[in-house]
Amino acid sequence: MKKILILPLLLFFLVQGSMAQTPKWVEKAKRAVFSIVTYDKNDKMLNTGNGFFVSEDGLALSDYTLFKGAERAVVITSEGKQMPVSLILGANDMYDVIKFRVAITEKKVPALVVAKTAPATGADAWMLPYSTQKSIACVTGKVKDVSKVAGEYHYYTLSMHMKDKMVSCPVMNAEGQVFGIAQKSSGIDTVTTCYAAGAAFAMSQKISALSLGDPALKSIGIRKGLPETEDQALVYLFMASSSLSGEDYEKLLDDFIRQFPANADGYLRRANYYASKGKDGQTWYDKAVADFNQALKVAQKKDDVYYNIGKLMYAYQLSKPEKTYKDWTYDTALKNVRQAIAIDPLPIYIQMEGDILFAQQDYAGALAAYEKVNTSNIASPATFFSAAKTKELLKGDPKEVVALMDSCITRCPQPITVDFAPYLLERAQMNMNADQARNAMLDYDAYHTAVKGEVNDVFYYYREQAALKARQFQRALDDIAKA
């Protein structure tokens, strides 16, 4: 009879001991763990794994390997709800961690708190597996070793048995805070030992201005988030404009505006994008106008917005539209640029004023603007060339035109490179107009050197004309033969 009583009593204490080992926080914490399914470019299942929320608005962590090659991903919560992964926010392929955002379908989701300090060697640890059941069996163990990663972060060796299906499950401390992301064991010690990358290290992963070139991120087809700071995000936008598809770039602009709603640059960039699609329908121009108006509302430097509006309208008119959209004329462009100048007469605004006046064939007004620019800190070969061509169109003294071209070429890199060589051709023709044939011939020679002899028959004809007028008859004969 005593033996019969002892057995149930022993079982009772074993059960009680097992329950005591399961911390109270497990029931709530397990709801933050989810399953992930990733899909390739053909929308076929690529990988399955685990992850967990670290913020109630959908920020989550998992392993990078799970996402490599994925075009989309879906998380499945412990309650069976499916939610898409919307943004990749950072990754490290060496330590196999990734940070991402889930487009949650609820106001908030259960989330774990990331531990601020690393547990000590010998501390208790719990691994929370993904489960759709009410009860959950935690894997318990100890922290065997703590090593440094990237200076202030940590990587853990755990005395704990882990199954393959537990990769990327959270590893918790006694307070119910997550300190690690479980990683696959390897080698001969897989029965008693596993590893965990620091959750704080995974949280530190970010998108930077240079992330567009990161091979680890490029191997994931899911959309990337923006850098957290405005300056970095603006650089990222600039780089993305030439590397992303139009649709992806538009989504990135939308993200920027949501993230930095008080930054006028986002509205200006999106307005320019909308205007570039204007040929597909007037509604795109309507959207551009709405963004320009919003930019004016939020901008601290309204002159910059007026300048960009004028610049866009100027470019629009240069494209020679079949039918002008509303008031997008040179006159309206000029009005906006002059509003910018009234606020702050920056040389770049005055240069745009000159360009618009030149397009309107108001050459006197354009020359006056270019002359102001040429006394400023942005004077360049291009600004002096603009002044020279404008003066030429005004039938100005040919020698004064040449003098402006001299200033243009003086500001070019010396010796003249192929990029600046066309200015030599322009000055050669202006020298001919000023009856300075020998100087024209020398300009043609300099051009020939700058382009390393890559010229055509027309070049030899013009140089022959200069040589003939300069009474260099043998040279003229040689060039006409080449022509």
Task: Give the predicted meaning of each segment.
Residues 21-22, 39-57, 63, 82-84, ...:
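A conserved glycine-rich beta-strand in the N-terminal activation segment of trypsin-fold
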Residues 22-26, 109, 181-252:
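C-terminal cap/linker of serine protease catalytic domains
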Residues 243, 277-278, 282, 316, ...:
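Structural motif corresponding to the intra-repeat A-B loop/turn of tetratricopeptide repeats
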Residues 268-269, 304-308, 348-353, 382-387, ...:
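Alpha-solenoid helical repeat scaffolds
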